[in-house]
Amino acid sequence: MEEVEDCNLFLLSKLASATPGVLDAESQAVQQRAWNFYVGLLLASKFAPAHRPVLLTGSRRDGEIDIRQQQDFDSPIPGVIRPYPSVVPDDIRTAARLGENLETLATAPLSGGHWRLFRTLHVYTEARTTGEIVDRTHQYCRCIDGLILPAAGKTRQQFKGRTEIFIGPGHHDLMGELYDVRSAVEHLHENRYLESFDRATRLDLVKKEAIVEHIARTALARIIDDDALWPHFANTPALEKFRALTASERTKIWGDPIDPLTAIADFDPQYIHDGMLGR
């Protein structure tokens, strides 16, 4: 298989089995752990593989490996600013820790459960494989919505204000512009950005997508990495209680803000040709 032959990164989950030749609950358990590890890597790095990721399940008996099942995943889309960043050892360690925490979180006795947080995480992982840049931007904005619980009719205003907990003050104009892209896609008005090719508009979309992805990913990673944050972000009632706290109380719980502009530190239009912008 070409994907396996060319692969230089393997995420492995294994356990001892009394029935290694049977695809049963043990197989499902190691598959889930491998998947959690992979999701952890998505949160730890903006990596994009050269081939579609593959999940192989099987057994090892008498020194021989027997592959019993193969699943192909949709491939994460390369970024425009840094298409193929290296996956470094710190990324792997972070991915493993996040993967372990995801397994713990799935069975944690949280009041109100954890559906909302896992749904938000699902939206993020799906967005990483979405081809069109405005659709990715839309989905990453939805991830942020999932973590701030905006009220109906006040979504744009609260998208600007409530994200201060993640990125600090001073970014209201930026967040408003991001929300405008989200709203355009939601109401099928993305022709404003895509119908005719304008290089400056497309470059601006590149920056916006990179920024909103960075906010969504780093916020999710911090929440999953810190079990003290789980009771505040796992579900809708928890978020309502969190929003009812004072700003200083919320800041104390969250910690230092994320710098959203880190995502575009390497942005240089001279290295971005029109073909990368969809022309």
Which residues make up each language-model segment?
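Generic structural signal for hydrophobic core residues of well-folded globular domains
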Residues: Y124-A127, G131, I144-A151, F166, ...
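Active-site-adjacent bridging/hinge elements
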Residues: S111-T120, R156, R182-H189
